[in-house]
Amino acid sequence: MTNAKLAPVSIVVILLAAVVVGGCGSQSNAAQKASMAAAGRRVSSAPLVKEPGQPGPVWKPVASIGAQPAAWIALRSGVTLLRFDQRLVHLALHAGSGEPGGQGWSYGDRIGTSEIHQILAAFNGGFKLSYGSGGFQADGHVAVALTVGLGSIVTYRNGTTDIGAWQEGVPARGVAVASVLQNLHLLVDHGVAAPTVENCILRCWGATLGGGSEVARSALGITGDAQLVWAAGEHLSPAQLAQALVDAGVVRAVELDINPEWIAGYLYVHHPGGPAGVPVVPGQLGIAGRLLAPYSRDFFTILAN
């Protein structure tokens, strides 16, 4: 999905400073200062924004397409939330070099040259495909067959994304599909957390390092007005993650990867030398290269339309 003329992408520095100072794993102090300095030359701070009449997170705008806010961040009870306006941005599913591997994908194992002037954000994908919890399809190629009823992140060829249970809500009839990533059953459906989030943690929501219930977790959801919301934190139970999404207005959501090594989200500051990724989850270990270098696992990017 491309436009003939791309408006400049700007990252708001006030929230990035707050997040980085909160401590984001592998980011060095020098890298923090460089990223913030680059951001500071381009943008100004933004006020707190609370959705009128809606209880829940306090959102701050962190990215704009031209003069229009396109992405917001909120930090709430140990959960980082990123919200994206699909009228201005679109989601792209990337194939990792090992998961699913292979050649011929439109979006491969790093943020590509066609994306570097469009990139707003990127974040981790789902469980390892060998775990048997879902499927992967893109560009008409099936890496792992899709399963009826599983939670599915479906991006259509018109650039929009929806989330739902496969063949039980998605895909939309008559709309061409570009990609699908499946992972487990829906974490949130009809604006309510799945009934298993309290009493079926390991079997239903994935094995954890050490067998604990509160580990690094992530998820992607969609609101009633079709905005995408990514949520992640370093010490979350399935119930805590689901509740944060519900509080953010999410009506359907898929849990993505879990455990510290695999959870990472970035916003990208644009400067003459190219985009620089700034981590958004306090304490995240991070991904070498911040998805601008080859990565073995599948992941998502958020791109300006």
Labelled PLM ranges:
Residues 1-11:
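Bacterial N-terminal signal peptides that target proteins for export
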Residues 20-23:
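C-terminal motif of bacterial Sec signal peptides marking the signal peptidase cleavage site
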Residues 25-145:
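Zymogen propeptides
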Residues 73, 80-83, 151-155, 218-222, ...:
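Short beta-strand scaffold segments in enzyme catalytic cores
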Residues 84-87, 155-160, 190, 222-226, ...:
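Short acidic-glycine loop/turn motifs at beta-strand connectors
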Residues 95-100, 105-247:
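Aspartyl protease catalytic domain
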Residues 232-275:
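Active-site signature of cysteine proteases
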Residues 262-305:
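C-terminal regions of proteins
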